[in-house]
A protein has these predicted regions:
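Short, Lys/Arg-enriched, disordered terminal segments
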Residues: 1-2, 145-149, 235-240
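Long, low-complexity, intrinsically disordered polar/charged segments
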Residues: 1-5, 96-109, 162-170
Length: 240
C-alpha cells in the first residue's frame, strides 16, 4: 500500500482548492496517511479527512496524547526522541523524520517561510522520496524541476532573508566589497553608505534600498534581515 506524509506550515488557515483536489485523489487511491499533531496544516488535514470519514490515517506525536486529534478512529503513533533535547523544534524533528522515512510520498503545503516545512522538503529530496509542494504565496504547485535543494533554499531565503553571517559569506564568495573582513562590519558599512540609518537608537532602512531587506517583528522588536543575492549586492554598490 502506498503512503503519504502530509505536512505544512502552521500559519496556513485554509486548504487551497488545488490541495483539496489532491486530497480527494489520495482518498480515491486509498493511500495510508501520516500527519502530525500541530496547529495549521496538520489540524486542517485531520479535520478534512474526519469530515470525509477517511480513517486510514496515522497521527504521529512525540507525546503520550497528541496535541490535536480530530477523531478517535485515527491511529496514534508515539515517536521516540532524544530525551536530552530541550528545544521543541529539535524534538519534533524526530517525528518528522519518522513520517518521511515511513512513507513513499511527501506532500508539503508551504508558505515559503516555515523552517519546519522547508526542512521536510529538503529531507524528502535527500531521501529520494516522491515529492509534491504546494506554494501558498503563489497559490500553485511547484514544478518538479524546481524541487532540488538549491532552488528550494533560494526560495526560502528569498522569503525569510539572510542573517548577517550568511550575507557576509555570500559577499566573500562573490568577491564584492572586499574591504569588509568580518560579518559584524556589514552593519557599519551599510550605515556609513546611508543604506541603513539610526534614529533615536532605532535602525531603519533607506527607502531607496527597501527591496534589499526584510523587516521582521518579533515580540515588539524589529529585526532586519538581508534579502540581497549577489546581483542585487553589486547593483546596490554601483548605485552608491
Amino acid at each position: 500500500m502506498s503512503s503519504v506524509f502530509i505536512t505544512g506550515s502552521s500559519s496556513i488557515k485554509d486548504l487551497p482548492n488545488d490541495v483539496i483536489t489532491s486530497l480527494e485523489n489520495i482518498i480515491d487511491k486509498g493511500f495510508e496517511i501520516f500527519v502530525g499533531d500541530a496547529k495549521g496544516v496538520d489540524t486542517l488535514i485531520q479535520q478534512y479527512f474526519y469530515k470525509r470519514n477517511y480513517t486510514n490515517i496515522n497521527i504521529c506525536t512525540i507525546y503520550e496524547t497528541p496535541r490535536y486529534l480530530a477523531s478517535n478512529k485515527f491511529k496514534i503513533i508515539q515517536v521516540d526522541y532524544d530525551k536530552n533535547l530541550f528545544g521543541e523544534r529539535e524534538k519534533q524533528t524526530y517525528k518528522d523524520e519518522f513520517m518521511t522515512l515511513n512513507s513513499n510520498y511527501s506532500f508539503v503545503i508551504w508558505d515559503g517561510k516555515s523552517k519546519g516545512s522547508f526542512e521536510n522538503i529538503k529531507r524528502a529530496i535527500i531521501s529520494n522520496k516522491k515529492l509534491k509542494v504546494f506554494y501558498t504565496l503563489e497559490n500553485r504547485f511547484l514544478e518538479k524541476e524546481l524541487l532540488n535543494i538549491e532552488n528550494i533554499t533560494n526560495l526560502y531565503k528569498q522569503n525569510t532573508g539572510y542573517t548577517q553571517t550568511e550575507i557576509y559569506n555570500k559577499i566573500k564568495e562573490s568577491k564584492i566589497y572586499t574591504n569588509i573582513n568580518k560579518a559584524n562590519e556589514i552593519k557599519k558599512w551599510l550605515i556609513d553608505n546611508d543604506i541603513l540609518k539610526i534614529y533615536n537608537d532605532k535602525l531603519s532602512i533607506n527607502q531607496k534600498y527597501k527591496n534589499y531587506f526584510i523587516v521582521e517583528n518579533y515580540r515588539g522588536n524589529e529585526n532586519i534581515k538581508y534579502k540581497a543575492n549577489s546581483a542585487k549586492l553589486k547593483s546596490a554598490q554601483q548605485s552608491i
